[in-house]
Amino acid sequence: MVDVNRFEYMKIGLASPEKIRSWSFGEVKKPETINYRTLKPEKDGLFCERIFGPTKDWECYCGKYKRIRYKGIICDRCGVEVTKSKVRRERMGHIELAAPVSHIWYFKGIPSRMGLVLDMSPRALEEIIYFASYVVTDPGESTLEKKQLLSEKEYRAYREKFGSSFTAEMGAEAVRKLLRDVELEKEVAGLREDLRMIQGQRRTRAIKRLEVLDAFRNSGNNPEWMVLEVLPVIPPELRPMVQLDGGRFATSDLNDLYRRVINRNNRLKRLLDLGAPNIIVQNEKRMLQEAVDALIDNGRRGRPVTGPGNRPLKSLSHMLKGKQGRFRQNLLGKRVDYSGRSVIVVGPNLKMYQCGLPKEMALELFKPFVMKELVSRGIAPNIKSAKRKIERVQPEIWDVLEEVIREHPVLLNRAPTLHRLGIQAFEPTLVEGRAIRLHPLVCTAYNADFDGDQMAVHVPLSAEAQAEARLLMLAAQNILNPKDGKPVVTPSQDMVLGNYYLTLERENAIGEGKIFSTVNEALIAYQNGYVHFHTRVAIPAGVLKNPTFTEAQNEKLLVTTVGKLIFNEILPTTFPYLNEPSMNNLQEATPDQYFLEKGTDIAAEIKSRPIIEPFKKGFLGNVIAEVFKRFETTETSRMLDRMKNLGFKHSTRAGITVGIADIIVLPDKQEILVEAQDNVDRVMKSYRRGLITEEERYERVVKSWNDAKDEIQSRLMKSLNRLNPIFMMSDSGARGNASNFTQLAGMRGLMAAPSGRIIELPIKSSFREGLTVQEYFISTHGARKGLADTALKTADSGYLTRRLVDVAQDVIIREDDCGTDRGIRVTALREGTEEIENLYDRLVGRTAFEKVVHPETGAVLVSTNELIDEDIARAITDAGIDNVEIRTAFTCNTSHGVCKKCYGRNLATGNDVEVGEAVGIIAAQSIGEPGTQLTMRTFHTGGVAGDDITQGLPRIQELFEARNPKGQAVISEIDGQVIDFTESRDKRELTIQGLSETRTYTIPFGSRLRVQLGEEVKAGQVFTEGSIDPKELLNVKGVSGVQNYLLQEVQKVYRMQGVEIGDKHVEVMVRQMIRRVRVIESGETSLLPGSLVDISTFKEACKEALRAGKALASAKPVLLGITKASLETDSFLSAASFQETTRVLTDAAIKGKSDYLRGLKENVIIGKLVPAGTGMTRYRQIGLEIAGEAPVEADSPVE
């Protein structure tokens, strides 16, 4: 076996017949597999032991030599080598073909490689290879041309005319002869010469031919190797035959395909020996060619060969292709040992870093560790008896198990793993029962709930793996979400409701205005029923010992509620006392207005004050973020556990439930409906009199019902009691929203038909009153659409993530600073007048490209190459600065990655990003994971043409695939002024007067104009509503224009759905789409004109030409969609495992490509550590010193 860590690159090429013979351990001569009586392999057959090795370890076929002591001996009776049976997985055989056969990949692929080398059409080649026409291989003294095709009739005629002075042949032999005659050097030189003169289609064809011929010339592959003389036979263990229960055999399809080839080959040999007539031999040769085609790629040409039940047989190509192929099924994803899965249930009493593992599962997972410990403690004399003890579940093993699992983290994973928080590490604690216990706060990250979800457990084995799990993957470390840097472990549902209820304030609650001397006194008063959580009371500020209080404040009384006193106990001691849900109170100090002088009339003062809002879900998230910012992970995870306990406890105490009596129907609902109906009647009247169009009528009807619903909603919200359970649930952010409530108590409103068009009949009833049959029927459309959408969306979103990961998987932070001389200028993102993303959000965690000074004071707010944190960003926006130039992945010069400075802060940790971080994959996950939350549909706003803007997931796909958008906008190619707009029966035209030229644009009918006569326009500006085609924008505004456009558009879609994603993730993806350039003129470099190359490759070639004083090449940037960009990557392993496996491998083999294993996928495929994180060469030197036999010492999470 090859040691995977020792080689630098992996190369693929065409195999010569000699090479195939050198791999082989013998020729397969017979189609037999195994003997039906003895069930042993037949000699010289497809499973022959002499060729492929013994079926039993250290035992030859005839049984003369058994046992390991005869290792390496070749039996003199049966010729089988005595060795391990494992060699049957690696030893190959071969079949000597009686006639050459063409390889279908090279003849049938698009473009046909054989056709390009020979400059013949694939149709002509097919006729020759499948014995339909003759081809002239040597015209001799005749008037025929070389490579001319002749039918049987013409052949005979020319034979009579010219005799044997010319040679014409058919079949793969003829093609091989032609391939042998190709003079690569001469052809390449000729083509390069031609390229200077020709244009159009001929040029395109010449470029394609040049590419293939040049590839053959440089790679050392010989074109005639595209025709096979010898066929390799893959090892028998890779095409196994197994006995089923009923004595029948199940076999791999490949054996059937090989059998057909051998049968036909043997028949052809016999026919040739007998000297059979030409027509019979030709037919047999054609059948052999078809058999080999079916073996290599069944179904590529003609009807596929079928097995029993008309099922097409799986050929060698199918073994590689698709989700079930070798690449995706076995190389990129393997099943692993030391794993288990079970249903999850909530574990409310766990710490943040713990999970509950069922006893029997833990015992099975940690079996080897327990066995070792049993022996070392002397409880069992040897491993065998230790195993027996475990299998019999003897009581003494439980103590040992507890000892073994302590400090040994396990990984929990929930499918689908959409982002890296879908796998986290926990310390296991043993629990009874058969369900895994999960901490409630990590559910958000896993998107888990307890309605029957299952999770998988994995055990990290090596000391290094355990250390990484503990230091990097522990749930208590993963507080922030990598996509936006906001806490992902915010409390939800019950926990939110409990804390909301606890911090409520109520007017005239029992015991209002009392003064307590200490917190404990207040709690005792509560327990004895003198006050309630919601009661506003006063307490001397000094007794709280809060370091943020001033001297003067400590002397005063603090007005607060009993519930808030309890809530503040969970916060770190150095925090301000939280009395209102405001950022000022959270970050600065408790506002002064809550402190009263001693001796004030407290009760009266409290009565006069308004009620303060309770703490809702969003504010709790801010609290967590602030704690994290100040104290890092350990303190945050402790605080989270306390917040969780408090929430559960008090939502239980509150006993908030929903009853039908909580839904109060609005008394004046009828009036609103009557008014709306009158409105609608008036509209209909106008329509019937022909004052308005059908469109306008429809829009006005829809609008008047929507207004009625909004009116009912706002009145409902006003009329609701603030202590109504349903209101509390929706207001706190625990569950539900205003719209749900309106449907329960107000009216359901308008529904959409399956087409997406809104039905103008409203549902006037609410769920509380009950729907009529017709209303119920209309409702079903929406419900059904919702479910169908969800199912489709999941698949689409998953596929989007897969493409994103593939295109960015080799983007890793590779160096500290790339020294780029460009940045980009960022401003707040706007859509019309609405702000989509403000400047503050865009600056936090980025590196400044230039120093920023305060416009008035001249103070330096941030210097060049300094990281902008929250405080600096706040200072910049407060100073009224509206644009800043920052470093970005767009302009980073690092090849195959990004540098630390251009990337900025790692959002998942809140610190600088480390070298080795796989930012490409994080970006792909951050964009793909919220994909399921995006809508599928195109919004129909009243069915106005041109207003159907694609949004949601389809829009994201359209952007990342760089497709021509639906409803494309017309854009200006020059700066200038709108001087004319004409509209005639068949077209609308807009004229722009530039400095040196005038351009006229045709505006499609039905699209709305966005410019007026006399208006100044810039290049790249839109004239009509709609989306811009990014490829067109690239030609007009260049690379930076299209980068900014894509970033802005992607952000627009996500932000409109309320999803926040850091700009840097989108930047990393867009950078991957625009990494390639198309060579226009090759100058005197080795680049081929018309070829796509990486920017870094192009720069290198130009540098070399400069050094040698040669002519430089010229190129223009190309925008590729993510699928195309993944397939264009330099690594053929990565591309082949993505899509179009056969095409990628065919191409790579001809070019003799080498894969230098730079990305992650390539290394996973060959079984190396990925070159990211601790797998990078620079971190490889770090070893773990294991003292004695103790496990790796890593700080265990503190209680």
Curated annotation (Swiss-Prot):
Assembly and binders: The RNAP catalytic core consists of 2 alpha, 1 beta, 1 beta' and 1 omega subunit. When a sigma factor is associated with the core the holoenzyme is formed, which can initiate transcription.
Annotated keywords: DNA-directed RNA polymerase, Magnesium, Metal-binding, Nucleotidyltransferase, Transcription, Transferase, Zinc
Stated role: DNA-dependent RNA polymerase catalyzes the transcription of DNA into RNA using the four ribonucleoside triphosphates as substrates.
Binding site for Zn(2+) 1: C60, C62, C75, C78
EC number(s) per entry: 2.7.7.6
Catalysis performed (reactions): RNA(n) + a ribonucleoside 5'-triphosphate = RNA(n+1) + diphosphate
Official protein name in the record: DNA-directed RNA polymerase subunit beta'
Annotated organism of origin: Exiguobacterium sibiricum (strain DSM 17290 / CCUG 55495 / CIP 109462 / JCM 13490 / 255-15)
Pfam family of the protein (one): RNA_pol_Rpb1_4
Chain sites annotated for binding Mg(2+): D449, D451, D453
Binding-site residues for Zn(2+) 2, renumbered to this chain: C818, C892, C899, C902
GO function term, MF aspect, one: DNA binding
Source organism superkingdom: Bacteria
A Gene Ontology BP annotation from the UniProt entry: DNA-templated transcription
